[in-house]
Amino acid sequence: MDLPIVLSHKTAWLYHNVARPSEPLSRASSLYDEDSLANEAEPTASLPKLGLDAKGLRASTAVEIVADYLVSLGVPREELDHIDTLVNFDFERSTPAGFRCHVFGAPVPPGHLIEVAEGLLVVDEAMCFVQAGSWMSESEQLEYGYEICARYHLNHLSTGDYIEMGQRYTVADLIAYCNENRSRQGAVRAAAVLKRVHDGARSPMETATAIMVVAKRSQGGLGYAKIELNHRVDVPNEFKYLAKAGYFEIDVYAPASGTGIEYNGSDHLDKQRSASDAERMTVLSALGFRMIVLTGTQFAHQLQLHRAMNAIALAMGLKCDRSEAFQKRQNDLREFVIRHWDGGL
């Protein structure tokens, strides 16, 4: 069995769902440079030893080893009917049962490979994002772009809550990868999706709010991509008597119209939090921002969210599409963005 094995495509996405860490992982120097891998002494010493380097290892056994490792991390076994792998060139492709081998068509960029166990690598999320177009819908890939560039992590394979974490990639990082690999499959579509992705979402519902605005009209969104997330507004000295905070951040902000959209989840029901929210809205309105609040209840009901999105469109100077066909698409998008919502977001 040729080593290392490189997990890619949907298998890589499954891995990143369950194992996305808060700190950078060990980057491989090259795909098949054994010396460079051996030189990574310190990180390699802590890598799991799976037995992939055993002499005479059968491909079927390697499949079992990799599948068992992924299951141990939390990937459901039913998601592993095959394991996606990546090689540099077509002549390196093999088709043992259980593996689905993909060809990059050039030396795989070493900076986008991560060592996860001895003899096992995984493509990073920049590369995985481009590959995602081969199995994700455009809405799913749009959401994935926000998640990669977010300040939280949500495991789509678990019913657990999201966790806050540092931002691992920027939209600029993903665009740079697409530009460097434009001839690779999926890069053109990924670059188009990234025109609607923005950095720094702090929660899944903040991502959901942004997607309802930026997604194409054909997907049920408002089709308005020129927004910012968590736009900082410093309180001027002459308004500081109105607020305790020295600055505020607007969840979703459209600079051209001065429209701000806030998502208030269940945590905003706390009395002290409600008072702070009221103070914040007062100051932002006094500063000339057009502020609109979305709630979990509105996201949970089609007509309530439709009316709220009409208000947002009106504030932004956009056409309000009230046709039955658009409302159907908008509701499909609403159901998509809240599909992991447990009522507490």
Regions inferred by a protein language model and the residue ranges of each:
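Surface segments flanking catalytic/ligand-binding clefts of nucleic-acid enzymes
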Residues: 164-345
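Short gly/ser-rich loop at a beta-strand->alpha-helix junction or flexible surface loop bordering the NTP-binding
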Residues: 1-185, 324, 331-345
